[in-house]
């Protein structure tokens, strides 16, 4: 439904982020999504005095929202302690964590509220949230892997990484996501650099946002259907 990109959505109210530039992600809570890289890059790059915020919308199958929120908060605090920039984790910028099960309209409100989408995952087939963020004009910053490499192009930032054996995917089928496979570990420094650039060059990203909306429409059912029809006709 591409019309959602053009609808008016009321922005959500996050008092701690009032007036801030918000980096955000929408992702399941699992190892493949690599939320740790996003959290580390944000708090390593930005000082608490800067008007920027981090928002994580996440959920985990079979886990109540409040437990999911606690797991993410513990993850954030563990990373902050490891960064050792400040003596207390409370000295860092407050993280915005949303774990309630919400409607598609509420997801669209998150896109409309935030400014720059970040997906540092180890691998993606497509990544619907990144595609939708691009359609909403929220310049995506993503690992250069999978479907994101195809649809983002020059409408966002694709960060290189290193291929390494899969590790830590314990909540899946026994024959999937083993060390016999490889995935891409994104450069945290690359994330930091692109997040800084997006924050400091908002006016310069306007053309990129327009490109993102155009590229989103390139993948409409109609356009893809016509492409498939042309390919089938070419074989006749």
Task: Show which residues each predicted segment covers.
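Short hydrophobic beta-strand element within catalytic cores of glycosyltransferases
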Residues: 139-142, 157-160
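Nucleotide-activated donor-binding/catalytic signature segment of Leloir-type glycosyltransferases, i.e.
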Residues: 65-108
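Acidic anion/phosphate-binding donor-loop and adjacent secondary structure
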Residues: 1-18
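Conserved donor-binding/catalytic core segment of Leloir-type glycosyltransferases
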Residues: 15-33, 39-42, 54-56
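C-terminal alpha-helical cap of glycosyltransferases
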Residues: 201, 221-236
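Aromatic "clamp/platform" in nucleotide-sugar-dependent glycosyltransferases that forms part
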Residues: 122
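A short, well-ordered alpha-helix in the C-terminal region of glycosyltransferases
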Residues: 190, 197, 204-218
